[in-house]
């Protein structure tokens, strides 16, 4: 009754977690997923065949694997660029670029990226940005405050802290992105289970 009518679409337990995650990151809307990779899968589903995705050239191996073995096969044009060189990043943006994917510090090389500068470049080009904030957590870094559009977490790691729960998260401020992610989370079935 009321807000919740089908648990995959939403339930009070998951909503409480999503609201907490959004508050931690300073976001308007949070989404909880079964795993960090489920969160990544949902974020990548924002893209269509022919879209161009810019990714920093050092990133988590699981992300590299999904990009090269799944997204590329689905027609997403993936380009790896050293985003520590902001000029190279700006030059890599094309008319079909839809998303800039970052993590900082990176896994495994611990590269530090200037999220505020990357977000400014992306906004000038009309491109969305995503930052995997798993390593620093919202305690040390809040990418939305720096202009990033989507924050991603593997909540299995520092947010959970004990590795006894597996999960992922996406947090946004943009209502259009929130609506699209809500539809994708429900349609793809990637949501966190209510008892996790």
Region annotations inferred by a language model:
Residues 29-196:
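Conserved PLP-enzyme active-site core in the AAT-like
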Residues 1-23, 28:
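A glycine-/small-polar-enriched, mobile loop at the entrance of the PLP active site in fold-type I
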């Amino acid at each position: 009754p009321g807000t919740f009518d089908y648990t995959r679409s939403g339930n009070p337990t998951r909503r409480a977690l999503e609201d907490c995650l959004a508050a931690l990151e300073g976001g308007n809307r949070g989404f909880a997923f079964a795993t960090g990779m489920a969160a990544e899968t949902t974020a990548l589903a924002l893209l269509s065949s022919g879209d161009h995705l810019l990714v920093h050239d050092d990133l988590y191996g699981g992300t590299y694997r999904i990009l090269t073995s799944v997204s590329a096969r689905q027609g997403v044009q993936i380009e790896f660029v050293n985003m520590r060189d902001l000029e190279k990043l700006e030059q890599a943006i094309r008319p079909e670029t839809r998303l800039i994917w970052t993590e900082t510090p990176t896994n495994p090389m611990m590269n530090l990226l200037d999220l505020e500068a990357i977000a400014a470049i992306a906004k000038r080009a009309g491109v969305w940005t995503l930052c995997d904030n798993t390593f620093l957590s919202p305690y040390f870094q809040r990418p939305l405050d720096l202009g990033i559009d989507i924050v991603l977490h593997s909540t299995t790691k520092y947010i959970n802290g004990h590795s006894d729960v597996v999960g992922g998260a996406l947090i946004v401020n943009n209502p259009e992105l929130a609506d699209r992610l809500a539809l994708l989370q429900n349609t793809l079935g990637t949501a966190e289970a209510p008892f996790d």
